[in-house]
Each structure stands twice: as C-alpha cells, then as structure tokens.
Amino acid sequence: MKRIVYLLLCVMVCGGCAKQKPHQFTNEVLNRMTPIKDQGDSETCWIYAMLATIETEHLRWGDSVNLSPYYIEKMMEQEPDAPESKRGEAATLLRLIEKYGIVGYDAMRSVDTPAPRFVFMLGAEYTPQEFARSLCRPGEYMQLMCDKDKPYYQEMELDMPDNWLHDRYLNIPMDSMIVKTERAVRAHHGVCWEDKEHGMAIVGIAHDENGKKYFIMKNSWGTDRPHGGLDYISFDAFRLHTVAVEMTKEAYGLP
C-alpha cells in the first residue's frame, strides 16, 4: 500500500490538527502477539496482517507460533493470476496457505531464502501443508464486509482489485461488524482488518482521555514508530474506512 495515504488516515484518526495535544490512551484489552515485523517497501501488508491474526488466535490457547510472510510472498510467484505488485486480501492469504502451506519465521527470514520443504516443530516433521492445517483448518475463518447498497446477511464477492481470487464475503451492517469485532477482541480472538490501502491485525481496545474508543492494531512497519509499531484507530474511523474483517467462525459466534 501507499504509506503516505495511510499516514494521512492516522493523522485524522489519532491526532487531528498538529497543534492539538496528543491523545493519552488507556488500554482496556491488549491481546498477546508475536514481535512486530517490517514489510519494508513491499505491498504485502495483507500477508503480515492475516498471519498476525492467526498467531494471536493461537496465542489465545497458549500455542506460540511465529510465521514467515516471505514464504507466502515466494509462493505467489507460482500463481499465474497474481499481480506483479503482490497485493492481495487477507482472504487471499487463507487460500494460499491452504494450497502451499506455511513455515515458521525462523525457517525463512527473507524472500531470497529457498523455501523449506519441511517444518520441524516440537520434535515432529511436517510438510508446509500439514503444518498449515494444524494452524488453520479449511473454512475456520470467515470474511465480513459492509456494503449498504447490497443485501445484508448474504455472501458475495468483494468488488476490489486486490481480490484476484474472487473470494466471497458475508455482507453485514457496519453496526454489527463493530459489535462483532469488539466482542471478538475482548474474548482475545485474532481479528484482521482491511481498508482500501492497508491491512493490520486488531490486538486490543483502548480509550482516550475523553472516553472515545479505539481499536489497537498491530502494524507491519517495524517498531521505530509511536507506540512501538501499534496504531490506535478510532471506532469512528473504523466505521468510515473498513473494507473487510476476518475472524474465526467461533469468534463471530457460529458453531
């Protein structure tokens, strides 16, 4: 994504006018997460965001995993319909790990590293596909969107260029999306958030000195930033800019 566009959003969301005093945030919930990574100049935020969501979901159960975004970036080279920019949606990540699997971060710390053929974990050997199935079952996650001009509570394709695999999303009202997202985060589930230009994992909830609520989001631009690489996005901005969120069916409230 274009960082300058997103930075303008952050100014609007978190600071407003530069002369205003910075907000003082109080964290209400801050879920467990793996170390913040840096996507560099790539446009692969969707990979980092959805992998971070899966990691937080497993940390909820005490199962620590740290996954390699570079493995998926390399596997995209085998996809004939993948854009040269390597852009995508979080749902794209779910499709790709189902097909190609996933490996740990320590096994592949660069896109230039050869992709491992096996994953070694707790004395066991897995293929990347077997390892992925142990982390994310097919159909475990669901995609949510909000388009007020289309029927609610029906599945439909998200009409975005980055949805090049033509994944389908459940269309729900924005009020419901905010309620579902807040409830999932407070229950310590991983949730992935996307707007038109960027994607991040939602890892917490906070309020400012005026009681205004924010989602705490784990970014993928490194830690040399305010709040150590976390971003505070107000519920109002979430309402205005959200394109989609992903969470497990359990987090949504389905059996």
Where are these regions (language model features)?
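Sec-dependent signal peptide recognition
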Residues: 2-7
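C-terminal motif of bacterial Sec signal peptides marking the signal peptidase cleavage site
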Residues: 13-16
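Bacterial Sec signal peptide processing site at the extreme N-terminus
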Residues: 18-25
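Active-site signature of cysteine proteases
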Residues: 34, 119-255
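Active-site nucleophilic cysteine motif
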Residues: 39-54, 83-95, 198
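Structural recognition of the beta-strand scaffold that forms the well-ordered cores
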Residues: 44-47, 70-74, 93-96, 104-106, ...
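Structured segments of extracytoplasmic/periplasmic soluble domains
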Residues: 48, 52-61, 96-103, 184
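Papain-like cysteine protease catalytic cores
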Residues: 65-135
